[in-house]
Amino acid sequence: MVLTTNLYSLNLRSTFFFTNTITCPTLFTFKLSSVSNPRRVFPNIRAHVSAASSNSELESLLSTDRKLISKQSNNGASSISSGVRLENISKSYEGITVLKDVTWEVKKGEKVGLIGVNGAGKTTQLRIITGQEEPDSGNVIWAKPNLKVAFLSQEFEVSMGKTVKEEFMCTFKEEMEIARKLENLQKAIEEAVDDLELMGKLLDEFDLLQRRAQEVDLDSIHAKISKLMSELGFVSEDADRLVASFSSGWQMRMSLGKILLQNPDLLLLDEPTNHLDLDTIEWLEGYLIKQDVPMVIISHDRAFLDQLCTKIVETEMGVSRTFDGNYSQYVISKAELVEAQYAAWEKQQKEIEATKDLISRLSAGANSGRASSAEKKLEKLQEEELIEKPFQRKQMKIRFPECGLSGRSVVTVKNLVFGFDDKMLFNKANLAIERGEKVAIIGPNGCGKSTLLKLIMGLEKPMRGEVILGEHNVLPNYFEQNQAEAQDLDKTVIETVVEAAVDWRIDDIKALLGRCNFKADMLDRKVSLLSGGEKARLAFCKFMVKPSTLLVLDEPTNHLDIPSKEMLEEAINEYKGTVITVSHDRYFIKQIVNRVIEVRDGGLMDYAGDYNYFLEKNVEARARELEREAELEEKAPKVKAKSKMSKAEREARKKQKMKAFQASKKKSKSSKNAKRWN
């Protein structure tokens, strides 16, 4: 294993990678320009100062500063993008090969989508790049030393007890350390008036630190944070709010923001869209598209991969293969490659069979020489020139068990009013969903999408209005976001699914579990021993086997790989019942829905068409609304608002004005006649 020396990595909790972790300093305001370099004027005053208590602190301050400057002096600018190459990487766990001679690279301007089924070794490759794991063999080759690497893992972490601004400030560990030391040096210089030698050393350190502060642009930190907070959707008032008061989606924005603030040389993203709403995903796409920094993105969000990636690296059965273009181009190229390889394999198999047949016919008598020649040809075909049959994952078809047809009316929402103490979510909202409709509920995080599903399921009660399930044979099957944590921890994996299944053969249940990446040795494992992702996949399997006429799904694709998503999409399209889903996966929504409901401004905006129809009409509606507002504002008279008057008051005022007008006319006429006769 060869790693370029002096690799400078970053580790912001789970967000960044640091070789030496520094405790996040206490937030304080420090402006470099406000700190003047103390003049080297030494007054002729002898002050008796006890240095015993401060000597060790000063020595520590001086030595630390020297180390800090020394450590950073050789760093390249973080704006200079570079790349990394994995060369013949192999990795095994407990005798099971996960990666086998994996080779690929990412360079400046490239955005690599790393894809594969769950457990294929995608995250392992990122961990090898960052040095968190060592490969069994192979090399990681860096294009330059001191490369700054940012890594957003699936399990992001933020400090719940900090404010939003404090959380972002923790990104600037070195800068805050410099600011703290500058402040301490300023105080030390003021106290060292009787020690010329010490003051000289302190001033030298101050000069070094001040230059370093200018290099890291210490003055701009607050402006950078404010700008990015705005881009991420935070308002200025959010800066002093606790991180704990935000939803997981907003906490993910904080983690992303901490990465983006560092301007890394290499950006590694592991499922970055998992907790983001559609608006934020589109913002993130727009932001990342503009960056030249090399990126490696693990994602099962096919629309995200389509928008961003310049090439796709597929890991299958431990082997990697690189395809130019985005995800859609990969799908086409992969199909063509498999087809061509299968045709070549089939042709070679026919040649092998024909050669074997020739050998058997020539083996006897005078043709033994020709038979020997044919045997050599066969040996060469089978050993040196053998074409492997292309691997094709077995496509398992799943169907949701159905219980006949429901009545025409499935869900009715009438004048719904609902909210929480600090926020009203729905204000006289109305909705009617009928049998056979497949509906997507969309909107920004926190607008009430999941709450609407809970109201439909009867898990929440309206403040006013009503939410009614149809009377005839409406049998809902509900998949909620935290369903993974609501399972019986004492049951085994197989017991959990068998309990929910009706009329399923045990072999079919095992096949379903296998398709969701539960190996045979995991079937008897207790649920309590599963990871978060494994619990989520188990909850999905349990959901798939329950009979119903109405599917209610809250972010069902969050922990699914692409083949599992395709399996779910096919099952939903074959389902004759009604489907209501909350999802931020645009590709998934496009495949399954025929109606879109947008939660906006306390109401439910209805788009009677698929997701493309919603995009078309939504843009037009927003544009028309803006045009109307601009037109009304332009035509509106620039006067103060009139006070409210009754009809009788308005009539009286009108008569009064008319009398005043008539009197004014008479007065004007008399005045003119008087002037005329004078």
Swiss-Prot record:
ATP binds at residues 116-123, 443-450. One of its GO terms (molecular function) is ATP hydrolysis activity. SMART domains: AAA. Residues 84-342, 411-626 form the ABC transporter domain. Residues 653-678 have a biased composition (Basic residues). Keywords: ATP-binding, Nucleotide-binding, Repeat, Transport. This is ABC transporter F family member 2. The gene is ABCF2.
